[in-house]
Each structure stands twice: as structure tokens, then as C-alpha cells.
Amino acid sequence: MCTMKKVTLPDEPVLEQRKDRTIEKIKDMTLKRTIARSILENLHDWFGIDESREQYIRECSDWMFFAVRENGHYAGFLCLKETGRQTVELAVMGVLRAYHRKGLGKALFHEAKKAAAKEGYSFMQVKTVKMGVYEDYDITNRFYLSLGFAEFEVIEELWGKENPCQIYVMSLK
């Protein structure tokens, strides 16, 4: 079992640090976009639509942004955006495929969840393509369920009938 220690650095706060892994809350807008681009451009199965990917990259600079470094290289990130006074949305998340199933996404999520609760939010939501439509998104759905999200609603028309939108929610209290 790895022991983790909390540390703070002057530029970007480090939320979790292990020998080979660091999770940081990123504040610099340019760095946010650089990390997002480097990750999302390598996840075409989920972010293959150029217009949508570019929108995430632009907008992520305005959101709470968490990044994980593995062996000194950025391997994933997660963004939270406020959708109401008490609610944040896990707006976009990406972990390079080579790092899937190694705990990076789960570690990122838990740090983001703690930060959202500390900021006073009561709920978190996330949207994805409904289970059973695409195999890659089935993996995503199972990941969100494993984190403790609960099914809330499916909106068939939000992204078009071929991409029904599943909304998951969780309490942060």
C-alpha cells in the first residue's frame, strides 16, 4: 500500500503526491488548455468530434481543473463547472488510454469531489452517452457507477437520438 502525503507548492497546489503520481489543482489558464489538448487529442474514441473537443479545450480554462502526473508526465485531467449554487458538473474528464484501469481517474475524481465539497457544493452531476449504445461509453458508464453516481435521467434528444444523454448524480454530503 502506498502512503500519500499532502503538500502545497506556491504555483499550483499539489493535492496528492505519491512517489510516481501527483494530483494538482491547476489555475493557470494556458496550462489548463495545454493539458486538455494533449490528453483529449489522444482519446479519439471519446473526443473524436473536432468541434466538441475544441469547445472543451476552450471552456476548461474557466472551470476548476485537476490534473494527474504519472512519472512526471500529465496523464489525465478532470474539470468541474458550476451548474447551480449547490451543484457542479463533472464537465470533462480524460485519462490517456495507457493509464486506464490504474487508478488515476478514480484518484482524480476523489480529489475533485473533496474540493467541490470544501467549496460548499452539495451535489455533482455528470452526463455521458447512455449505457448500451457504444462499448467505449459503456466503460465510461460503469466507471461513473463505480464512483457512486446514481442514474438520474436520460434525455434522448439532447445530443440526438443516436446519442441519448444519461445524467448521473451524487450527493457530496
Where are these regions (language model features)?
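Short amphipathic alpha-helix that is part of the acyltransferase structural core
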Residues: 2-51
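Conserved beta-strand in the GNAT
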Residues: 67, 73-81, 87-94
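A conserved beta-turn-beta hairpin within the catalytic core of GNAT-like acetyltransferases
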Residues: 82-91, 100, 119-122, 164
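A short, internal acetyl-CoA/4′-phosphopantetheine-binding micro-motif in the GNAT/acyltransferase core
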Residues: 93-101, 129-132
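Conserved acetyl-CoA-binding loop-helix of GNAT-fold acetyltransferases
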Residues: 101-114, 118, 142
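Conserved GNAT acetyl-CoA-binding A-motif
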Residues: 116-135
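Short glycine/proline-centered loop/turn elements that form peptide/ligand docking sites
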Residues: 135-140, 154-164
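Conserved active-site tyrosine of GNAT-family acetyltransferases
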Residues: 144, 149
